[in-house]
Amino acid sequence: MSIEHQSYVEPLGVKGKVILTSFLGLDANNIFQQNIFLNQLSNFVNLNCSTVVSLVEDSEFDQLCEKKLFVRNIYNHNLKWIHMPIADLKAPDHEFKKKWITTKTLLKNDLLKGNNIVLHCKGGIGRSGTVAALILIEHGEENANAIKCVRKKRQGAIENELQEQFVLDYRTIS
């Protein structure tokens, strides 16, 4: 599968792309399937992805699949894994913001090297869209335009007023 078959945004000034997706490994009935998950990971490797960022909370892992198995398979595919949980339908909280200071640098470096990164939440719309917009802003995009760019590529992204306001208010800090 080519990158064109994915929902992605392209930060300014880098070759890498940010792929937005739902929870990895889910079938049409939202049931985790190991074979689907492994195929997705192989596809991400073929698409020159370097990092998978999980935006779901531990309770969501508990509902969908075994977290240890999930992470082990990501590492087995020589991908990096970053866990940046955000509550469903919410904007990033204080813990996210603290961790984001270092995480955004790691992601920027991946993108500068031309690697693609994968953002996923449960549905691949709200939290993934919000963080994708933050990455665009970190690369020089104006806040409102970052929202437009993400929504153009992923319909329904940044799914509520709380997330939208967070992106509009976001200020990049070095």
Regions found by a protein language model. Name each.
Residues C121:
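Short cysteine clusters
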Residues R127:
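Conserved SAM/SAH-binding loop-helix junction
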Residues M1-V118, T130-S174:
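Cys-dependent protein tyrosine phosphatase-like superfamily
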Residues G124:
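Conserved G/P- and acidic residue-centered "switch" motifs that form tight phosphate/ATP-binding loops
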